[in-house]
């Protein structure tokens, strides 16, 4: 009995505490937004919210685009997708593109930015926008395309400082993608209708 009583303290030792559960952090709203744009290792577009990170965007101009479908209004987006566009004399719009939401976008590669310094893309977009807040809008030679060209020149996109409104118009025509079928129809249908009317009238007069 003495031995049993002497060994009882060893048998009655309390069991070790269970391992603690790992704490799970709840993501904040800001972290959720970051995942929306940078999830899957890349930047995600949001057409509904008009967010086109690292893109040149384009939308038709009423009447002008009806006759010349390759001519429209252009803007450039920040790394977060916010649109900046030279919308009028001494005014650069932010997140409210003139003539409506983008119909077409041209996705650029931030890895092709050769300017030095942190956030070179956003810095170039900001500096170009600040510059055009002091400029008069000229439809023929200093317009929305010129604003985008200045931003690309400041960031030395594709290691070039020769961007201009002609090259932008051509590249956007070749590499631009429509956001939807409706955007494509909105751009080209008026031109097709006008062309059909002109051809019809021409045929009628030639048959007389």
Curated annotation (Swiss-Prot):
Keywords of the record, alphabetical order, are: Cell projection, Membrane, Transmembrane, Transmembrane helix
Q: Which InterPro entries match?
A: TMEM222/RTE1
Q: Name one GO cellular component term.
A: dendrite
Instruction: Tell me where in or outside the cell this protein is found.
Output: Membrane; Cell projection, Dendrite
Q: Which Pfam families match?
A: RTE1 (PF05608)
Q: Please list the residue ranges that the record places on the Extracellular side of the membrane.
A: 1-55, 186
Q: How does it sit in the membrane?
A: Multi-pass membrane protein
Tell me where on the tree of life, at the top rank, the source sits. Eukaryota
- Region named Disordered: 1-34
Q: Which residues cross the membrane?
A: 56-76, 165-185, 187-207
The record's annotation in PANTHER family points to: TRANSMEMBRANE PROTEIN 222
Protein name, entry field:
Transmembrane protein 222
Q: Which organism is it from?
A: Mus musculus (Mouse)
Task: Identify the taxonomic lineage of the organism of origin.
Answer: Eukaryota, Metazoa, Chordata, Craniata, Vertebrata
């Amino acid at each position: 009995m003495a031995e049993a009583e002497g060994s009882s303290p060893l048998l009655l030792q309390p069991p070790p505490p269970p391992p603690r559960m790992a704490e799970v952090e709840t993501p904040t709203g800001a972290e959720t937004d970051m995942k929306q744009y940078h999830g899957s290792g890349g930047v995600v577009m949001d057409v509904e919210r008009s967010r086109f990170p690292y893109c040149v965007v384009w939308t038709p101009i009423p009447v002008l685009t009806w006759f010349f479908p390759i001519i429209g209004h252009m803007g450039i987006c920040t790394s977060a997708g916010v649109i900046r566009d030279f919308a009028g004399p001494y005014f650069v719009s932010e997140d409210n593109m003139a003539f409506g939401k983008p119909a077409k976008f041209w996705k650029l590669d931030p890895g092709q930015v050769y300017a030095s310094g942190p956030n070179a893309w956003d810095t170039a977009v900001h500096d170009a926008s600040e510059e055009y807040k002091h400029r008069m809008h000229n439809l023929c030679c200093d317009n929305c395309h010129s604003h985008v060209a200045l931003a690309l020149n400041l960031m030395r996109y594709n290691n070039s400082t020769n961007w201009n409104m002609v090259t932008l118009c051509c590249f956007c025509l070749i590499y631009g993608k429509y956001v939807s079928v409706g955007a494509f129809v909105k751009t080209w249908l008026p031109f097709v209708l006008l062309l059909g009317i002109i051809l019809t009238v021409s045929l009628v007069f030639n048959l007389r």
